Amino acid sequence: MISFSHWNSHIRSGLSLSMIPSANSRFAFIIQRNYIPVVNSQNTRWKRLCGTQSVWSPYKKKHVLVNRLKHISLFPKPIFARKFTTRQKSEDQKQWRILRITFLVLPFTVGGLWILYRVKNRKNNIFSFDELELEERSNRPRSIFGKIKQFFNILLRSFNLFIIFSPIIITLPFIALISFLHLRSLSSLTVSIWLRFLVTQLERAGATFIKLGQWAASRTDLFPPAFCKTLSKLHSHVTPHSLAYTQSVICKTYKVESIEEIFVNFNPIPIGVGAIAQVYTATIKKAATQQDNSYFTSMLQSIGFRQKNISDAPVTQDVAIKVLHPNVEKYISLDLQILGFFAKLINLVPSMKWLSLPDEVKVFGAMLNQQLNLHYEALHLNQFRLNFRGNRYVEFPAPYDDYTTNQILLEDYMPGIPLSAFLKHKSGPFNKLLANTGNNALFQMLIVDNFTHADLHPGNVLVKFYKGIPKTIFNQDNEINDSIYKILSTCSTEEWDSAMEELNILGYRPTLVFLDAGLVTKLSTQDQKNFLDLFQAVLTFHGYEAGLLMVERSRQTERVINKDIFALKMEHLLNEIQKSTLSLKSLQIGTILQEVMTMAREHHVRIEANFANTVLSILLVEGAGRQLYPEMDLLSNATPYLRSASSKSNVSLTNPMVQLWIALEARQFLLLSTSKETVEKWVKSDMIAPNI
């Protein structure tokens, strides 16, 4: 029991004393006053309690904590308690200083590093690719009942597919015999009818097989050209799902009772129906972000600034809404497992192993999984917008990140004229600019960014017109109305020519808008090197060396048939092109690459899927460009992009990108310093790029 009579005088003088007792602990005294006088060091009672002379100083403000009392069981020593033992004074002050600095500096350091990491690695979406892949793996059935249910679903789906494709399987040996008798040509009437029937059955089989046919049409390295050409006509004749389903998905996703709470107008008729999803147009009440295509806004977004929230944007905005079909994920998952089983079965045949069908099914499945999760398309659009920021002639629709889920993609509605309308009329003052713009966009994707749109057919490209400069935050009213675009899309050739001339006189300029970015291609370092080496070989007509390089760098070198003959065929192909070419600008790179892919198939030279997709993109863009402007010089368009990429890469003469850039620069110099006739003569006589 402690007597506190000693403290009465201090309490009367204005000191406040509090004691916090606890069993098996120490007492702590907190003395509060505006200032505290020096305690008499001769006071024996104080010395008996404290065990030492007090180190308090006059006029010490606020609280003083005394925690080292002898002969008394006090609290466990607090971490911030200051010790007053003279012997430990310097050590305690040093520890206190270290603790204080640590607890003050550490939160700011960690927080600052986290902010820097977020700004540097920020993608304009709340999801990353790793998170999406984790989400896909988590959707797989884990329980025994789920696996049993999935097994029976696979059996039912297999039976359904067997009924659909049984006529194809039964007639296949007969068709193979006819093809063999006609010297392996698939151009006969019977085979053509069979191929059209195959297309019909693929359309009946559903989304997976529609996409499978479209994918096979791009793999000229695996299938005959006539087969690929027929499959390229495959379209998704899918019945649109009901409006009620779309409304239920939107209400469930956005947690509203009706779509009128979000949209002012909602067009119930879809503007596009695909194998996996369909697209509507609507007017949103409050835009989730202030959609702005200006360079300044894009620059701010690239360094981490987010756009305004929905509550800050009172204006309406026209949007496009992509909604997945019901149960499409379930059916595609079942189909991929069935395809994987049959791919492994076919791979057991020795003559079919070079195709590596199980690997191709994995690549095809990864492609479909990207399209089944609309977050991927939003990520791709954001990346394309970042890559092309400041480009006045190329646009991508801006996705609304806060409104995008794996089932719904909300993005800007982009009015415009389909590029197919320009290809149909084939005349106009903007054709040359459109052809060069498309090629420039392709080379930036392929060479500079290594992030290429993998579905560049004309249906996914629109043309918008701006007056002088594109729309910015300072200039909003320089764009043509959507109704005018619809009229132009359906007008006759005479009306078309007149309208284009009038737009040109008024100062309007075209801008390409790329849609449907669900699929992209990224070449690995080795694939990019192979592509540039092949591109350089085509330019310099070194066919034999290019053929040997393709064989050496293929995935299954041991399965290649007649390596030397393949290299000789490459040399013969480029020699024939060299002799028949009137000028270098008339080189059709896409056609040459397609011939190379055909020879690779005949000799079992294994080509990577991304490499094949890149060749397909070049074929599509070059084909459309030459229809618009037959005199287009593809190689001249590639030169500035190779120059830019070479300056950023390893500047070495062994770098294929640097070599290709030097070759194109030399060609440009020759064209400027001599006549075209002289250059063409040098090319034909093999003086510029001799074959050794």
Curated annotation (Swiss-Prot):
TM region(s), chain numbering: 96-116, 161-181
Entries under Pfam families matching the protein: ABC1
Main location: mitochondrion
GO-annotated biological processes: mitochondrion organization
Alphabetical list of CDD domains matching this protein: ADCK2-like
Membrane topology: Multi-pass membrane protein
GO cellular component terms given for this protein: mitochondrial membrane; mitochondrion
Taxonomic superkingdom: Eukaryota
Keyword Ribonucleoprotein: no
Transit peptide residues according to the UniProt entry: 1-91
Localization terms from the record: Mitochondrion membrane
Keywords: Membrane, Mitochondrion, Transit peptide, Transmembrane, Transmembrane helix
Family matches, as InterPro entries: ABC1_dom (IPR004147), ADCK2_dom (IPR044095), ADCK_kinase (IPR052402), Kinase-like_dom_sf (IPR011009)
Gene Ontology molecular functions: kinase activity
Entry keyword annotation includes Iron-sulfur: no
Positions in coiled-coil regions: none
Family recorded in the similarity comment: Belongs to the protein kinase superfamily. ADCK protein kinase family.
Protein's UniProt name: ABC1 family protein C21C3.03, mitochondrial
Organism field: Schizosaccharomyces pombe (strain 972 / ATCC 24843)
Taxonomy of the source species: Eukaryota, Fungi, Dikarya, Ascomycota, Taphrinomycotina
